[in-house]
Curated annotation (Swiss-Prot):
Gene Ontology terms: cellular component: cell surface; endoplasmic reticulum; plasma membrane; side of membrane
UniProt similarity note: Belongs to the repulsive guidance molecule (RGM) family.
Lineage: Eukaryota, Metazoa, Chordata, Craniata, Vertebrata
Organism: Homo sapiens (Human)
Protein name per the record: Repulsive guidance molecule A
Assembly mode: Interacts with NEO1, BMP2 and BMP4.
Length: 450
């Protein structure tokens, strides 16, 4: 009997070739092939995301989501989405057998179904209109405008991630890397197929390298029948509770209420719910400066057309190495030598002489009793800015993590991320979980095929 990998090579293309309409029993060859792809190449051991692509295509074309015999356009859309997914992960899949088998299979299926390479793609998991009375939005709002509803017929739930920016500024990425950055000027926090977030950081003190966020721009892109393009902009001393056009929702489309702005505290705290992409954004003004926090599904985080062009997507890849500050070393040296002696030799921003280290520690302990990275960031900010409002910035950043982070075991971080130059440049992408709902039907098949 052939080993599983050799059998996969033999059956890979043959299985795909049998998927044409009216292919009869030979069409069944596709499903064992896909089963092999899912069971033979564990996602956790490779940066290649082909299993995610396979699972999404399985989910879109099997069970209650399977296109009917006359739904060739829908099937072609699913294939184009599959092809797009493989292109996004191509850089990390060179030499991966499952990846190359999938690429060849997509070409075969598109040829058999006369699918054009150009055309619409299906959104993640083909969705249907919700039952009457089941929508939390307007009664005529389509289900595609409520991200979590698309999981009702699957056993899996979305895997959410968090990114936050606060203080001087400190960045917590979608992969829980924690960095302190200079990043003066305008920088992109998020740049994917659904929205863009850009921050502008300005010096806190004249001539100092210490910066903080003074402006934030969020662009929600036009999305099907859900929302029109909307722009939100906040600046120092101006935290509006509406988009720049004065509206508070997604416009005039059926699913407009799937995008909403809510003012929690006037001039201090705004929350934006984008239910059509399962995303929650929190913007605060603390003192003169802004903080940002977001909760977003991995699927949306990774919806990027060209990975190679995303080198400055800070929430995903972190700050460039030459923009990072080792604030833990600053904190350790300050504790041992005193902030005044450190100021002359430290590459970090100059510390105001009027703010003693002991006072910074005492003020941060009042709000942040756990000596984690948020506490250390607080001490760093007080030493480098002399502004006590940065204590609240760190406190609220941690409160936002508690509300938005899906893993309650990762609320507190204790070790700063020290990127190697190669890793910082490459910016390893987030590794999404396989779609469990698509894998469940395969569990019974694995003893047969693996």
């Amino acid at each position: 009997m052939q080993p599983p990998r050799e059998r996969l090579v033999v059956t890979g293309r043959a299985g795909w070739m049998g998927m044409g309409r009216g292919a009869g029993r030979s069409a069944l060859g596709f499903w064992p092939t896909l089963a092999f792809l899912l069971c033979s190449f564990p996602a956790a051991t490779s940066p290649c995301k082909i299993l995610k692509c396979n699972s999404e295509f399985w989910s879109a074309t099997s069970g209650s989501h399977a296109p009917a015999s006359d739904d060739t356009p829908e099937f072609c859309a699913a294939l184009r989405s599959y092809a797009l997914c493989t292109r996004r992960t191509a850089r990390t899949c060179r030499g991966d057998l499952a990846y190359h088998s999938a690429v060849h299979g997509i070409e075969d299926l598109m040829s058999q179904h006369n699918c054009s390479k150009d055309g619409p793609t299906s959104q993640p998991r083909l969705r249907t209109l919700p039952p009457a009375g089941d929508s939390q939005e307007r009664s005529d709002s389509p289900e595609i405008c409520h991200y979590e509803k698309s999981f009702h017929k699957h056993s899996a739930t979305p895997n959410y991630t968090h990114c936050g920016l606060f203080g001087d500024p400190h960045l917590r990425t979608f992969t829980d890397r924690f960095q302190t950055c200079k990043v003066q000027g305008a920088w992109p926090l998020i740049d994917n197929n659904y929205l863009n977030v850009q921050v502008t950081n300005t010096p806190v003190l004249p001539g100092s390298a210490a910066t903080a966020t003074s402006k934030l721009t969020i662009i929600f892109k036009n999305f099907q029948e859900c929302v029109d393009q909307k722009v939100y902009q906040a600046e120092m001393d101006e935290l509006p509770a509406a988009f720049v056009d004065g509206s508070k929702n997604g416009g005039d489309k059926h699913g407009a209420n799937s995008l909403k702005i809510t003012e929690k505290v006037s001039g201090q705290h705004v929350e934006i719910q984008a239910k059509y992409i399962g995303t929650t954004i929190v913007v605060r003004q603390v003192g003169r400066y802004l903080t940002f926090a977001v909760r977003m599904p991995e699927e949306v985080v990774n919806a990027v057309e060209d990975w190679d062009s995303q080198g400055l997507y800070l929430c995903l890849r972190g700050c460039p190495l030459n923009q990072q500050i080792d604030f833990q070393a600053f904190h350790t040296n300050a504790e041992g030598t005193g902030a005044r002696r450190l100021a002359a030799a430290s590459p970090a921003p100059t510390a105001p002489e009027t703010f003693p280290y002991e006072t910074a520690v005492a003020k941060c302990k009042e709000k942040l009793p756990v000596e984690d990275l948020y506490y250390q960031a607080c001490v760093f900010d007080l030493l480098t800015t002399g502004d006590v409002n940065f204590t609240l910035a760190a406190y609220y950043a941690l409160e936002d993590v508690k509300m938005l982070h899906s893993n309650k075991d990762k609320l507190h971080l204790y070790e700063r991320t020290r990127d190697l130059p190669g890793r910082a440049a490459a910016g390893l992408p987030l590794a999404p979980r396989p779609l469990l709902g698509a894998l469940v039907p395969l569990l019974a098949l694995l003893p047969v095929f693996c």
